A protein has these predicted regions:
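PLP-dependent aminotransferase class I/II
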Residues: 1-192
Length: 192
């Protein structure tokens, strides 16, 4: 399985059950609190990652937009060296994300036509090794095998974000101490 979502066929229908819909409706009562927590987490990531060369935290691009801060993502400069990157795609991917409920699928090869940069995968694996779950940004739809023959209108931005981006933990249970630990492990993974 790959550490990013790879869609090779169409045919799954993951509709929300009535129970999940009820849980979702109940979550609406704490939505503002969750968004405030995510916003606080983003601010903490911003403060703790300030000055880390080669890593940029994605922020709200303009006051004209209002982010829900669902994901806190970083971009790794391609020239940033991360420990272990030289061997990162030589073995089967560990800690890969799966489909519904974490179900993983067997990968036919170690590589696909498009995958995150070596330093991004090395950082994901370094974080995974210390119990921190992260994942690459979503693979662009036009790069998914299932859509390879479809028309596309692209400018390179989605490919660049996919190759350089990493999603960091930011859920409602992530504490300030967790963020400090995550950032410290990010710093530990960077070659000096």
């Amino acid at each position: 399985s790959y550490p990013y979502y790879q869609h090779e066929e169409i045919g799954y229908n993951y509709r929300m059950s009535n129970i999940c819909a009820g849980i979702g409706r109940g979550q609406m009562t704490v939505l503002d609190e969750h968004i405030a927590h995510h916003q606080h987490t983003c601010q903490l990531y911003k403060e703790l990652l300030a000055g880390v060369e080669g890593i940029v935290l994605h922020e709200n691009p303009s006051s004209r937009f209002d982010s829900n801060y669902w994901l806190n993502t970083i971009l790794l400069d391609p020239s940033l060296h991360v420990k272990g990157e030289e061997h990162v795609y030589e073995t089967a991917v560990q800690g890969a994300v799966g489909g519904a409920a974490g179900v993983t699928h067997v990968a036919s090869s170690l590589h696909t036509d498009s995958e995150p940069n070596r330093n991004v995968e090395a950082m994901r694996m370094a974080l995974d090794a210390v119990g921190i779950e992260s994942r690459p940004l979503w693979k662009p739809m036009h790069l998914q095998p299932v859509y390879k023959n479809n028309p596309r209108y692209v400018n390179g931005v989605s490919e660049s974000l996919f190759k350089q981006g990493l999603c960091l933990p930011s859920g409602p249970c992530v504490t300030d101490e967790d963020v400090a630990y995550i950032v410290q492990e990010i710093k530990n993974s960077v070659k000096k």
